[in-house]
Every structure is written in structure tokens, then in C-alpha cells.
Amino acid sequence: MSETSEQMEETVQSGNEPISKSTWMGFIKNLATFTGDLSTLSAPSFILSGTSLLEYMSYWFEFPELFVTIVDFPTPKERMLAVLKWYITGLSREYASRNKNYGTEKKPLNPILGELFYGSWDSSKGKVELTAEQVSHHGPESAAHVVCKEAGITVDTHNKYRSGFSGRTVYVNQLGQLRVHLEKYNETYYITLPNISLEGLWFMAPYIELYGSTYIVSNTNYITKIDYSGRGYFRGTKNSFKATIFEKNEDPDYIVEGVWTGESKLTIPSLKSTIFFLSIPSLEATPITVKPESEMGDWESRNVWKEVSAALASGNYDIVSSKKSTIEQSQRDMRKKEEAEGAVWARRYFKWEEHDSDARNALAQAVLEVIEPGFWIYIGDTHPSLPAGEQPVKRME
């Protein structure tokens, strides 16, 4: 193809640089011919977001008032409804904010093993604090602990996923959980994570849809089942959901329907009434507050990826590839050194609990589906004398 012909190719804007249709379709071809989990496939620079996947853990908490005021509701039924409202706002930030910011969906950077992310939000009840750590790299797995001590509310979460390509769509199966604990009531809410489909690839405008169902299961016997649907070829509304709240083996108390990036309504079947529930566009998200990058440790996300992020922001993809390759090679070298010395990487804040029977039984019995065993339990700082944001060079489990 001549230079003139190349300049006339259809393009799409990505960051500060237009991407040609042929370049984009080459990327799609790589997806289609790749075998195995897509997390092991190195993505081209033009589709990267410049933000580490570990930092995405914070998106669940960008409406801190909805989070901390869950404890204010007087009955288990109302608290379940409050948990659902917080969860829906988290979906909107976790799975739609990149599309809003960039105009199209972007792939996050894969965190390195041991990567750390800290931050906080102010709320009417006190500070909400987050500690996150990349606890596995192959396959990728992140864990986080979030607490508002004054409100007596904590969240522990971990996320791992499997991904693949079929037809025109990337599918991501999320296998982790969110667990919300309310100290005052000794209540725990076990929450499964939605499966994701990345649509619009053939039109050079990828966006996320959620599909299937997720569950919120409480030890109060209240259950929420959330069904997701999207825009089909001929019908349907993008980002639609229907949530049904019921006590185990009882009729529904509440039904919430709408769009998890837009508005939703609450129906109370016993009263045969429908009222307003939530309007995402009317809410203003509160991004996490972090310390200045100059004060961050070497293992903190924004420090690890700062040169890659800066190059992505300027559209210099050669520098992106070079800096990203340097980080990845350093990690490979570290793993080889550990293997040669018989060392195993130990996590700073979390420990894997294989036989997490209480949660597994609660979820499996309630939703009648297989729940993968185990959970990354927050155990506090195993190296309190070490500055935040740092990891020992070599550690034994």
C-alpha cells in the first residue's frame, strides 16, 4: 500500500494519536487466533488506559456516603436495599468510567506481583481507607481491604478472572467476591462479581456490557439476585439490569429495574407501587485521595507505571512499549532469581485461605451454583517496620 493510501485509511482516535483501521483489525486478528487466557496476551499500546488494574479496586467506593450510611438503616431488608444501591453505583464506576473518560473502553495495565495501592475518602462518618495488593500475576489476582472504623463497616474483596475471544466479543469471567461486614449488626453480605463482554470491537469503539447474574447473599437470610441484559442487534437497552430482593423461600420484597449507568426505579410488590430509586448521572463521584507521587514507595501503582502512563498520555507508543517491556522483564528476572534460590513471594497484607467454608456454604446454598473455594484474607501489615509502598526484595512464606 502506498503512503498516500495509508494516510487515507479510516482511523479512530486513541489517546492523542489516530489508529488506522488496518492496525485495529490486526489487533482483532491477534485476538481471534490467540489460544489460552487473554490475560497472557500483550496488548498493543494504543488500547491501554494508563491506569493499573489494581487501582480499579477503588472505583467501588467513589460514592463514600452511600457506602458508610448502609449502617443507618434499621432493618435487614432496608440494609440489603442500601447495599444494592451502593453496589450499582460501584458497577457504574468500575465498568463504565473509562468509556466516559476516553470515549471508548481501554484495557488497564496488568499489575506486577506485589504492587501496592493505598488511598482514602472523607465521609460524614469518618475516613474510608483502602489497602490493595496484587497477590498473584499468573493468573492475575488483586485483593483489597476497605474500612471506615467510625461507621463499623469493612469490605474485603479479591478479583481474579479468565478471559477469551469468541466471534466478535471478548468475554471475561470474574471469579472473585466482595464481602461487606457491618460490625453493629454482625451482618455479612457476600457479593459475586459480574461477567463482562467487551462489545463494539469490529466498529473500533469497544464498550463493556455485563451479562448473566450476580448475587448479594446476607447472613440475615436476605438475598438479592441481579440479572443483566444489554442492547441486542434489534432491541434492548444498553446496561440494563433487574434486581430482586427477597427473604429466602419468600416472595420478593423489592424489585429494582433500570440502567446501571443511568436511572432505575424501585417497585414494592406488596404495595403495588413504583418509586424512584437511583440516578447515576445526578451523582458526583469522589475519586480516591492518594499521597503525592513524590512520597510514594517503589511498589505503589502510580510510581510503578508513571513513565508508561506519561507516555500514553502524550501518545508516544514507542516509549510506552519500551518502558512497559523494561518493567515486565524485571519481573521475569525476579521470578527466575526466586526460583533459583528456592524463595517464594509472600504477600504483605493478605493470606490465602483455601477452606473458606462459611462463605462458600452461604453462597452455594443460596444461589445453587458452584463457588470457587478460598479467599484472600486481610491479615494486617506483616512488615510494619517497612515504609508503606515498599516490599522486601526477597521473602519466604
From Swiss-Prot:
<dbReference type="GO" id="GO:0015918">
    <property type="term" value="P:sterol transport"/>
</dbReference>
<dbReference type="GO" id="GO:0006629">
    <property type="term" value="P:lipid metabolic process"/>
</dbReference>
<dbReference type="GO" id="GO:0120009">
    <property type="term" value="P:intermembrane lipid transfer"/>
</dbReference>
<dbReference type="InterPro" id="IPR037239">
    <property type="entry name" value="OSBP_sf"/>
</dbReference>
<keyword id="KW-0325">Glycoprotein</keyword>
<dbReference type="GO" id="GO:0016020">
    <property type="term" value="C:membrane"/>
</dbReference>
<comment type="similarity">
    <text>Belongs to the OSBP family.</text>
</comment>
<dbReference type="InterPro" id="IPR000648">
    <property type="entry name" value="Oxysterol-bd"/>
</dbReference>
<dbReference type="InterPro" id="IPR018494">
    <property type="entry name" value="Oxysterol-bd_CS"/>
</dbReference>
<dbReference type="GO" id="GO:0005829">
    <property type="term" value="C:cytosol"/>
</dbReference>
<dbReference type="Pfam" id="PF01237">
    <property type="entry name" value="Oxysterol_BP"/>
</dbReference>
<keyword id="KW-0256">Endoplasmic reticulum</keyword>
<dbReference type="GO" id="GO:0008142">
    <property type="term" value="F:oxysterol binding"/>
</dbReference>
<keyword id="KW-0445">Lipid transport</keyword>
<protein>
    <recommendedName>
        <fullName>Oxysterol-binding protein homolog C354.07c</fullName>
    </recommendedName>
</protein>
<feature type="glycosylation site" description="N-linked (GlcNAc...) asparagine">
    <location>
        <position position="186"/>
    </location>
</feature>
<dbReference type="GO" id="GO:0005783">
    <property type="term" value="C:endoplasmic reticulum"/>
</dbReference>
<feature type="glycosylation site" description="N-linked (GlcNAc...) asparagine">
    <location>
        <position position="195"/>
    </location>
</feature>
<keyword id="KW-0446">Lipid-binding</keyword>
<keyword id="KW-0813">Transport</keyword>
<dbReference type="GO" id="GO:0120015">
    <property type="term" value="F:sterol transfer activity"/>
</dbReference>
